[in-house]
């Protein structure tokens, strides 16, 4: 997984440079469709990196880097969905560097496996709701 995290970190850093370059030029036409077309597969891979360890080992992965990466994934997903309805130009200058840094944290602090089985639905619902509330 560290190779995938490094690749995603480079994609998010590249998107940050892409947005910064277009913001610096102050161009009237911004290639939003290009940005969202690059962001969609990156979000899909990022989501898979977050969910596959949980599904494979059937235990909850908790750690600083994992939690921060999950929260940033939620924020980027909200940005991606919101970009279809609202003009959110400029928000990416904060989100993409945060996403790259969160993936660095996830690689450095991968977390540990907690003994809570994911079959314990009330607890999983509680943890999921708390992460969603914090991330959104």
Explain the meaning of each model-derived region.
Residues 13-23, 44-55, 128-129:
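Membrane-embedded alpha-helical segments in integral membrane proteins
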Residues 45-94:
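Membrane-interface helix-loop-helix modules in multi-pass inner-membrane proteins
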Residues 30-39, 65-66, 89-100:
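Cytoplasmic-side transmembrane-helix entry/capping segments in multi-pass membrane proteins
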Residues 38-54, 102-108:
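A generic, lipid-embedded transmembrane alpha helix
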């Amino acid at each position: 997984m560290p190779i995938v995290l490094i690749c995603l970190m480079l994609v998010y850093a590249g998107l940050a440079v892409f947005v910064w370059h277009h913001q610096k030029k102050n161009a009237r036409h911004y290639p939003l469709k290009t940005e969202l077309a690059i962001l969609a597969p990156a979000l899909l891979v990022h989501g898979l990196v977050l969910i596959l360890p949980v599904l494979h080992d059937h235990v909850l992965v908790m750690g600083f880097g994992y939690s921060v990466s999950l929260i940033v994934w939620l924020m980027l997903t909200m940005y991606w969905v919101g970009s279809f309805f609202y003009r959110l130009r400029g928000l990416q200058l904060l989100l993409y560097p945060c996403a790259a840094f969160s993936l660095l944290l996830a690689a450095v602090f991968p977390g540990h496996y907690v003994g809570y089985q994911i079959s314990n639905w009330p607890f999983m619902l509680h943890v999921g709701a708390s992460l969603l509330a914090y991330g959104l």
